[in-house]
């Protein structure tokens, strides 16, 4: 008979030795369980929409919306507000696109980005006012029911939903500035950099804030090993995106050459510092455990 300790060791070794394919599958499954699935069709629309491409972009977004909705139901997951909105919005957009004349289609192609972001803002803000923040539907499927109505759980979801609402509003305002004030829907800053940065900040905040709340609670309960993540843990990972932003700035002449180079240098430098700090932390933890 194999003792339980040996079995645990084998299980842990197997977990550490997971194949890249298995790790990729687990990562994909984790994404399916989060709000990113509800936002993915909107990202597809933002990436592919443009003059003469609205029909294709809306069609791809609608197909992805239906796919995620069906997969959720097959996996036994509940219907999500954002998932239903995706199907309704992009289905309606397809119908409207076909019934509009050329002038109407041109207007829609100009303003669809702002319409989409304002719609998302209203959904996020409305869900808060309705006391059912849209992220809570995803979070409830990741924790036991006994925690659903605890102040900490509710506060985390209100704050995270608020962060997404702010990101959608920033993106909408940036797009409006590009279209209505600069009269340039292809402006790299208002059309891409600012809007993408807002979404990335909200996504990183979604990962960072629950850890902060959990660690703060552990500190209050007297756990000497608990450490509350600082602002560096929030902003640090975002530096990864400075490199592609710098490259795109240079490639598309989106600003002074020095600015694009500065983005790349700061991004690479920050990533190097973060990796060095992680290695130092791992070494310290290994010494402490040995």
Q: Where are the model-predicted features located?
A:
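Short, amphipathic, aromatic/basic-enriched membrane-interface segments that mark the entry/exit
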Residues: 22-34, 52-56, 78-84, 158-160, ...
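Structural signature of hydrophobic alpha-helical transmembrane segments
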Residues: 47-64
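Alpha-helical transmembrane segments
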Residues: 108-127, 190-200
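Membrane-helix boundary/juxtamembrane motif in polytopic membrane proteins
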Residues: 143-166, 187-189, 215-236
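Alpha-helical transmembrane segments and their membrane-interface junctions
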Residues: 165-185, 243-261
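Alpha-helical transmembrane segments and their immediate juxtamembrane interface regions
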Residues: 184-229, 270-286
